Amino acid sequence: MYYKAVAESMPADYPIYLYGIPQCAVNDISPALAARVAEACPNVIGLKYSFNDMIRLQKFMEIREGTFSVFSGCDDMFAMTALAGADGIVSGNAQAIPEHYVAVWEAVKAGDAKKSNADSASD
């Protein structure tokens, strides 16, 4: 398995994230594949998922009994993915307007879904 060869070429404690961006890649990473990789490679600790599919995102979050780290790559779905339990977002836009993303994240962590969605809609 390619992923195992890459993971084993790194130090055992070196954390590796998969990157799922099916609309741009020929090699889609399904939740089943991510689960197999996570099982075979202890240092593969999570995934950045850059597609607006909440069902898949939630399936990724179930890997390793919920300990597999999942980050969104979709700016327009940040509040929704954070509310669903994603670990955060990897966002180019956040480099330019970090206050917006911090406000959404803080609202989610405070349990204020209404405010997080309002902040998210203010793009």
Describe each model-derived feature in a short phrase:
Residues 1:
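Glycine-rich anion/phosphate-binding loops
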Residues 7-14, 21-123:
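Catalytic alpha/beta core domains of metabolic enzymes, predominantly
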